[in-house]
């Protein structure tokens, strides 16, 4: 993190298949400048100064599972080497799978005239999270997809300002579908079939 030259680095562990734990790295001098959030007697220790309830030991321990998971995926694919090279190779495997499975969905959505695909159409230039504006409210569509065995959601996803800038009514919301490295081509085929029925 020091190499980035930033004062604060925030990360959500669940974004890499870990627990719902926020991770924060503060440059020490900057962290000591910020107002403390804890007891007065903990103000001199950086990690205590900004952790008013103390560390959540269970969540911290669970974060080790992220590295264990990457190592398990590496082992399953015969990937060796040091931790950094295993992590890089597993990242590339996961990313290739995400791109492969999301591309047919993007092609399908781009071919419809009743949805507005948000973001790039090229699967290689986006995260495997796909949002579309519909010609109607998104929540009922999400609920109907759920009745068809598809787990997705609808709403604003805390992107209130970006949606407003795109001219999307917050009450109407968007439909969001996500893939991950464990999503199969068959999963996406089922999703497309359900979208055909529901839309």
Where are these regions (language model features)?
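Pyridoxal 5′-phosphate
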Residues: 1-199
């Amino acid at each position: 993190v020091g190499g980035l030259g930033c004062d604060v680095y925030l990360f959500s562990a669940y974004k890499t298949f870990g627990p719902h734990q926020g991770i924060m790295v503060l440059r020490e001098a900057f962290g000591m400048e910020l107002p403390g959030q804890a007891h007065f007697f903990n103000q001199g220790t950086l990690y205590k100064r900004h952790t008013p309830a103390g560390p959540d030991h269970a969540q911290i321990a669970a974060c080790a599972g992220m590295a264990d998971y990457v190592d398990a995926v590496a082992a399953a694919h015969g990937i060796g080497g040091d931790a950094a090279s295993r992590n890089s190779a597993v990242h590339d495997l996961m990313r290739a799978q995400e791109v492969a499975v999301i591309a047919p969905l993007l092609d399908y959505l781009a071919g419809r005239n009743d949805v507005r695909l948000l973001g790039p159409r090229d699967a290689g230039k986006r995260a495997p999270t796909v949002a579309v504006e519909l010609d109607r409210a998104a929540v009922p569509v999400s609920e109907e997809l759920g009745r068809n065995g598809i787990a997705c959601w609808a709403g604003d996803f805390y992107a209130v300002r970006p949606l407003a800038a795109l001219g999307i009514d917050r009450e109407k919301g968007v439909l969001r579908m996500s893939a991950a490295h464990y999503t199969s081509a068959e999963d996406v085929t089922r999703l497309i079939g359900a979208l055909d029925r529901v839309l």
